[in-house]
Amino acid sequence: MPEETSHIPPAAAAFPPVSRREVLQATAGAVALAALPGGAADSAAAAEAGAAAGHSLRITVNGHAHELAIDPRQSILDVLRERLNLTGTKKGCNQGACGACTILLNGQRVNACLTLAAMHDGAEITTIEGVAQGEALHPLQAAFIEHDGFQCGYCTGGQIMSGLGCIAEGHAGSPAEIKAWMSGNICRCGAYPGIVAAIAQANKAVRS
Amino acid sequence: MIPFTLQKVLTEAEAIAAAGQGGRYIAGGTTLIDLMREEVERPEKLVDINALPIKHIRAEGGDLVIGALARMSEVAAHPETQRLQPLIAETLVEGASPQLRNVASIGGNLLQRCRCPFFRMLDAGCNKRAPGTGCSAIEGLNGGHAILGTSDQCAATHPSDLAVALIALDATMRVTGPGYERSFPVDELFRLPGTTPHLEHTLRPGELIAEIRVPGGPHARRARYLKVRDRSSYEFAVVSAAAALHVEGGIVRDARIACGGVGTRPWRMRAVERALIGKAPDRAAFEAAARQATEGVKPLSGNHYKVELLPRTIVRALEMAGEVA
Amino acid sequence: MTMQAIGKPHSRVDGRAKVTGGARYAAEFNQPDQLYAVVVGSTVGLGRILRIDAGAVAQMPGVRAVISHLNAPRLAYQPHKGGTDPANGERLHVLQDDQVRFYGQPVAVIVADSLDHAERAAAALAVSYAGETPVVDPLDAKVQPVAPQAGRAGADRSRGDADAAFAAAPVTVEASFDMARENHTPMEPHATIAAWSGDRLTLWSKSQFVVNEQAEIAAIFGMPAANVQVICPFVGGGFGTSLRTWPHVTLAAIAARQVGRPVKLVLTRRQMFHTTGHRPRTLQRVALGATTDGRLTSLIHEGSGETSRYEQFVEALTSTSGFMYSCPNVRTRYRLLPMDTGTPTFMRGPGEASGMYAVESAIDELSYKLGIDPVELRRRNEPAIDEAEKLPFSSRSLMQCYALGAERFGWASRDPRPRAMRDGRLLIGWGVASASYPCFFSPASARVRLLADGSAEVEAASSDMGPGTYTSMTQVAAETLSLPLDKVRFSLGRSDFPATPSHGGSQTMSSVGSAVRAACLAVQAELAKRAVADRRSQLFGASIDSVEWREGRLSRKGDAAAGPSYSELVTGAGGSPVEAGASAARDAAIAKQYSMHAFGAVFVEVSVDPDLGLVRLRRAVGAYGAGRIVNPKLATSQCIGGMVGGLGMALMERTALDPRDGRPVNAHMGDYLVPVNLDVPHLEAHFVEEQDPHVNPLGVKGLGEVALVGMAPAIANAVFHATGKRVRELPIRIENLLDV
């Protein structure tokens, strides 16, 4: 077969399983290869039929207890956003590479996107919606407004939750320290100087 | 993500039994969940080992002993780490982000999978993910790939910073298997890709990492980690080097050097170490020794610069170590 | 009380919403009975779909629909060209045929009852292709450059004889530059929730241009625009990627119609690199000729940029070269490189950022060749008028920007010699560059309602992706109506609000601000008209010309006594809100009389570790002449944000394509590097006092773009000053500097 294989991404070569693969000759002599991402739909379907049951989860979010049945695949992020309609916690990359989903899980800052809810039965979660005391903003929230530590606002919840963690951990002692310990939260608008100033100010307020 | 069942275990025996039935251990999950979402990892049963009592961090004699489930952040912040092995603390803080470090376990850190972009893309050939499908990087974009320990099947670097330090420090690890325990140098955990790049480590089926032991010594205090990267933080190493020196009477008595970002596994630089012994710890000696680091390198089309950068990184790490009071 | 809302550093009026998690972005308007859609993208970079094995996937748990070109509705795709769509070519018609034009092009969409089920099914869907090798590298010999078919921005221009002057020049610089493709990478992924109610469609959709999205979707589905409502109160970063209506919006609407329920569709981070535009990679050549005392005699700027096969994306790559410098002989040439890729789109400072990177780098090279300070070189070539258009500038404060910036930066103490400044083992470099961006002012409208309680509601379609539209428009209305800020409520982000232009091109403040001002004046006029006609009013019978508004009260001219307030007038007229709308647009005559641009000067300090090739920004000072500054606090943030964006452009950002199939290899937020907190040092933004009565009624010039434009060349120039090595590609990375 007069195939020119050099231009085919090695990608397509030997997977998915051969039974699902087609090798076809296109009209202009181009080579066709099937690329089945993931493969094995058949076995997966069987497995999924059995997993439909769901997993029982009890969590406390911002002081409110919740009990719900979840798919074990659900991250805390998806449970917050899609099940509890707590959308202040943002999905930025869903890969642990941006920090927009930062929450406090049992008091520690974590990426909610890489946290399976089913592994945290009984957990205490604080999200950005639970930081203010009623109408009274937390000093860090107020400082974010004062220092304009955001523009679009999409990373802001994660920045503030991460900032609370940063302060609690004792890593907010200087601007340089804050920068290093806040580098897990990307702000594409580039509001970093305001973020640093806000955390430095709130750190003083919280510690005094 | 394919559906899976989740089993929480309370003892090592329970964990090992569950693994024997096809379970896959999950601790922090920062690598595993990410790759499950991409369907690069497709476990049908997860064994949640977070309740196991292997979270300790303590001194035993001069050794630092770390339970496999201790979190990166806990180990980095622990006074015994800072007292006995500041290199471990420094290395941990250079990795990932504070949020990830709060979750990621020490055992999981060592077993994290590579960051080669093709490994993560199901529609790309990758011998590590799907043996026999070819390597998309070797003939493609490979600026971030390895120059040491590659084969014609794989050139992905090992991403762990911690592993670099542990190998430099001659750390050992204890693993628990079905009815036994065994200990071995962390160095022996990592395999070269060869013709089986999908096999990354030497753990036997069902084995559970229980503990890491980092022996003390006169080198431990004079030890630094340098991670070179285009972004100041939250990026994997382009090239990194851990360097520990024991200097006495103005002469290097002992040197421990390992590098990241250059090898398909964390790479101990024994030839560089040997070249330093007996020399005065100065830049000239460091540069001469570091030239040994590139012996046997096999750069790819896009990563020749690492051949240049590697010895310089080692020199700088040695200088940093030498400056430690 | 004299109100002064404009010019004050007010905090954001939406600040509380944003710091409490209360601001809701497109994907956060969950609807009852909502299903989830996930896009399946092509895994080949060019070719034809042979087969889609939908049957197996349709049986998977939770799956409600598998939609591809095989079963998607044939859509009307009526002609539509919004202001942000390329003038030439035709947009991608999604799921309408079996052709694959670029890697990642949507080939199917899965709808399921949960996100997990939809993602699983999307991963399992088997699609086979007849694949061909795409052309994705601008340097590929198979690329056939074409001249942009239309549009002034893309036209070749020439004055004098630049080539002859270059050949004759005693001092010359000639250099080529290669700037990488970039992706906007906003924090919020593109997202659309689509819900049909009969033949009416509501889209909660991330957009910088809701009225265009309304019009485009209506054209695609062949339905009246009035039947489409687009809602987007918050945009989680845009930078241009949400100016156009990309295929996923259509997919969400198709999916929702097919399953008869609301559908949420959010792109994955990887998909954000496939179908939602990018800053095109550009290849440029600049040739400068000068006299020995540093007068430019020739400026040649040639550039080319990526585009797709199906649309011509044209940006302002060479447009500033005609007016930045006084030079008798100027020639610019711009070509497009059609390749097998998705269509690029506007990204912050589109064209200017790329083009001025090249020219400002070349000017810097010339300064070293001449031995003239780069600021002084620019001063010697500062034009009195726009020599390309032969028009005066409405205002041009570039030299004032240089003076202010140089002073704040301490430029005078710079050692001009490369490699002369050090900090320990680090090489220190100081660099400078100019920035410019046009002052656009597009037709816009707004509506104001005065309520019986004396407060005002103001509405305009518009968007706020971060510059602070909510706040600045509130300030404009408060100032115009003489109301305190908390008596004004400004709403945006709905396509049924008065139409506004795209939230891009730094034109929101000028266009929407002018419309808001006009609407406020209109509602005052309406209220005055009613007052003088109302028998119960103390102003009854007065002629409309004899009354005036003073600090929110209507009084007879010359009468010192305070007249009735808004509240009294509205209440007196029966209490129903009094409403008026108005539009604003640039006087066409003004555009023929003046060349209108914002300018800036950017000073940076970098360190270079010569052993490790590491460049780090140490500080930056930007000085801008941008007309009236409505809110200095927000304007400062906007400029600092632009500098951070320029830092990314200079040292980090690059979308790398696999030449074999065109896939963006680093389509991941861990691999497409943008600056993190630790990368960003002390940054200063300063504004020179500038009063420009010509640009628009508010005298504002816009900041979003000009804030980014000069940063990358300033950094590149600083790297040269530090190292003596001229890197002529962006981003400048470790591997570029291991030989310094």
Regions found by a protein language model. Give the residues of each.
Chain C
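Flexible, low-hydrophobicity surface segments
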Residues: 1-151, 172-175, 248, 258
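Glycine-rich loop/linker segments at domain edges
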Residues: 8, 14-17, 84, 153-192, ...
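Extended active-site and interfacial segments that coordinate phosphate-rich ligands
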Residues: 13-17, 123-136, 208, 215, ...
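C-terminal catalytic domains of large/alpha subunits in multi-subunit enzymes
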Residues: 59-60, 69-70, 222-227, 257-263, ...
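Short acidic, glycine/serine/threonine-rich loops at helix termini
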Residues: 76-81, 121-124, 214-216, 239-245, ...
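Short Pro/Gly-enriched beta-strand edge/turn motifs at strand-loop
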Residues: 80-82, 167-182, 265-272, 425-434, ...
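Conserved beta-alpha junction segments in alpha/beta enzyme cores
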Residues: 162-221, 305, 315, 429-455, ...
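Conserved beta-strand/loop scaffold segments within soluble protein domains that form the structured core
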Residues: 213, 232-234, 239-329
